[in-house]
Amino acid sequence: MNNLEKQTREIVIDVVERSAIQPGNLFVLGLSSSEILGSRIGKQSSLEVGQIVVEVVLDELNKRGVHLAVQGCEHVNRALVVERHVAESKQLEIVNVVPNLHAGGSAQMAAFQLMSDPVEVEEVIAHAGLDIGDTAIGMHIKRVQIPLIPCQRELGGAHVTALASRPKLIGGARADYNMDIIRKS
């Protein structure tokens, strides 16, 4: 499990740095502990794996003042765990569900244990996110989404992808644009 912690940290640092996410922004984590363990999503949920990954992600985001939103599975309509103060300050709709291994998943259970005052919210519009195990985080990332290829494409048996976002380009051929801080062009 030490290797899981080390690899998770490397991936998170890579994605956070390249996404150009700012303090106060939201970052979504989608996680299948089953996929990390080499099983099909939802078939071998592991609280231990969820705790390791969420603890590392929280640590790296807290260092940067970025807020974590942990996505649950389809059985909780992909609701997300955030800190209550984040839900209130961003006027997010709080919903009533307590995650378990088979409704919400191991990452949400870990977030409930590791956060100070966790609540579930129906949806967010995050600036970036990390998807470990093909959990489909795109519905919670703001437009325009930019795929980021992480420094490692697998974590255990799980496929790893990431998304950043940028403002829409409007105005057409006559318009000038600010530099794309994600792609540096």
Swiss-Prot record:
SUPFAM superfamilies: TTHA0583/YokD-like (SSF110710). InterPro entries: Antibiotic_NAT-like, DUF436. Pfam families: DUF436 (PF04260). HAMAP family: UPF0340. Belongs to the UPF0340 family. This is UPF0340 protein SPy_1898/M5005_Spy1614. It comes from Streptococcus pyogenes serotype M1. The lineage of its organism: Bacteria, Bacillati, Bacillota, Bacilli, Lactobacillales.
